[in-house]
Amino acid sequence: MIKEFTVNIDDSELININSKIKQYPWSSIEDMEGWSYGTNKTYLKELCDYWVKEFDWKKHEKKINSFKNYKTNIDGLNIHFIKEEGSGKNPKTLLLLHGWPGSIVEFLEVIKPLAHPEEFGGNIDDAFTVIAPSLPGFGFSDYPKRPIGPRKIAEILNKMMIKNLNNENYLAQGGDWGATICNWLGYDHSTNCKAIHINCLTMRHPKGAINKQERAWE
């Protein structure tokens, strides 16, 4: 079952978050310059100051809700995803996977160009129907009750694509943690996931024979 979903964070929760940020005991962090021991304190204070005084969550909430959002249950987890139907007669389906620490917000500026390239100077025949899920434990998806790794997440997302969304054939793209999940989609579920594109090389073939030049480079 697929249910429509609207992002609507209660004002009381936003007030609570801002209150915690304002009351943070900055004296508990040593006054050390640079980033050798973690995030620079001065930078972090500037970031938190922006968060409290300038950041407008409702503006970003509205942006997310400008797309069609849904939730569906796979293996007991309610998975949130954005779906944008592609233009044209037969757009391929593209699964976009974010990383850590990340979210579907990473894709908000590329969903429309991918789904409707003709509106951005491209060819309508290159359109994709875009599926952008929040990974389990991220964003608006449920968190698993016990630890799961990228291979299991790939299994869950493949089930979502073929059983819940009726996509027997799809493509996948991912970066960071999403790249590792993409690798497992291509490795374990190639019957349905026909191709992957990754921008982070997290899995490699076993090392083969190397020549003299390659050995010198190492």
Name each region found by the language model.
Residues 9-12, 39, 148:
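Short coil/turn linker and secondary-structure boundary residues
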Residues 32-41:
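Coupling/switch/interface segments within P-loop NTPase motor domains and analogous charged loops
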Residues 5, 23-26, 42-218:
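Catalytic cores of eukaryotic secretory-pathway lumenal/extracellular enzymes that build
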Residues 1-26:
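Mature N-terminal segment immediately following signal peptide/propeptide cleavage
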